[in-house]
Amino acid sequence: MTPGETLATEKRCVGELDARADALRALSASGIPFVVAGAYAYFEYTGIFRDTKDLDVFLRRKDVDAAFEVLGSAGFRCEMEDEVWIGKAFRGEWFVDLIFSSGNGIAVVDDAWFHHAREAEVMGVPVLVAPPEEIIWSKGFVCERERYDGHDVSNLIRAVGHQMSWERLLDRYGEHWEVLLSHLVMYRFAFPGERSQVPRWVMEELLRRGAETVAEGDWERRVCRGRLVSRTQYEHAVYELGYDDARAEVTNPAREVLENVAKLPAGGER
């Protein structure tokens, strides 16, 4: 048992911890590809313990139904909470999150999550933990009033920035590179003595892009990208002021399936 798990036993009952371990054992035995993220991966990389009410398992959308069957056989009640990004497996009052995308539909779990994952042990079960690059990609878009994951991003960079593939992280953020830049500026503020954890070329490249947007000026299109990072804090701009909603335009495989189903005639005829 890791130091973090030892601390967890002080605040969580045995039944809850057993449920998490049983879920990991069942999924591991099934051969379904998955990685552990959330508080366990965060502790693995940073050494920072955070008491957690659940276990976050990340997997591809196409494997969720199979995971539901496996966990159902292990005594869990499974349901899809949101077709865009998350399912849940319950055992009594305890649950496991099965996550296949970020809530905004951008950080979709793909093969790279497993290819670059790291070996670890969680609840006595050998597992893979999500790569820090993909964790930062997913967490970077969580900037709600009641939950802001930017501090997690900073602590991850401080801990493992020198080990990360910054080329892949830049590629992950793609057209949303300004979100990454905002977190890197905050990181530099938080840890001025460890700025070198972020390669100089990364900052130079992002600041170059930023300078280009200053010269570019305003977009002609009246769009709000704020709901990509906060679902609620920009509702006024979209619903009252009439801005186009960038969140609604994200291409996500799960969202496309939902849209196709919605177009079917009554009775499900094609």
Residue locations for each model-derived region?
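Anion (oxyanion) recognition and catalysis
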Residues: 28, 72, 121
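Short helix-loop-helix/strand-helix junction enriched in hydrophobic and basic residues
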Residues: 28, 33-40, 44-46, 129-131
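Short aromatic/hydrophobic-glycine micro-motifs
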Residues: 32, 76-77, 162, 211
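Conserved catalytic core of two-metal-ion nucleotidyltransferases
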Residues: 72-112
